[in-house]
Amino acid sequence: MPKALIVYGSTTGNTEGVAEAIAKTLNSEGMETTVVNVADVTAPGLAEGYDVVLLGCSTWGDDEIELQEDFVPLYEDLDRAGLKDKKVGVFGCGDSSYTYFCGAVDVIEKKAEELGATLVASSLKIDGEPDSAEVLDWAREVLARV
């Protein structure tokens, strides 16, 4: 059975809800999932033992891209997470009225690629409140590529 690690950073609860919805979909299709708050993990060896790693982070800030506060330490140490040759997907919530809509998703995705990860799906960028159909479709896309 393939295994997925879903790590999320959430301030208002939206990104956490998306992480849980993704896990529910993957579980229902036979994938074993582990969902953890980014505040509860460290980077060294994070991806070890997983077939796919999904990283979820909300975006803050208007004039510059700000990752969700708890996600910053993991992002800064992501080179120690073991993402080389690992399948990775990135998702997050934001507000399209800001200059850098879901900018955190973009910078995490870019760094994962620079570290040798293979993007398993196009990033999922949610504007405001999560749309369950959009999340379901993305989770199924991930599942099809693992």
Curated annotation (Swiss-Prot):
Q: Which cofactor does it need?
A: FMN
Similarity comment text for this entry: Belongs to the flavodoxin family.
A molecular function (GO) term: FMN binding
Protein name listed in UniProt: Flavodoxin
Natural source organism: Megalodesulfovibrio gigas (strain ATCC 19364 / DSM 1382 / NCIMB 9332 / VKM B-1759) (Desulfovibrio gigas)
Instruction: Extract the PROSITE patterns matched here.
Output: FLAVODOXIN (PS00201), FLAVODOXIN_LIKE (PS50902)
Query: Pfam families in the record, alphabetically?
Result: Flavodoxin_1
Instruction: Domain (Flavodoxin-like): give its ranges.
Output: 4-143
Q: Which UniProt keywords apply?
A: Electron transport, Flavoprotein, FMN, Transport
Q: Which InterPro entries match?
A: Flav_short (IPR010087), Flavdoxin-like (IPR001094), Flavodoxin (IPR050619), Flavodoxin/NO_synth (IPR008254), Flavodoxin_CS (IPR001226), Flavoprotein-like_sf (IPR029039)
Report TM segments: none
NCBIfam families (alphabetical)? flav_short
Would I find Transport among this entry's keywords? yes
Record's function text: Electron-transfer proteins that function in various electron transport systems in microorganisms. Functionally interchangeable with ferredoxin.
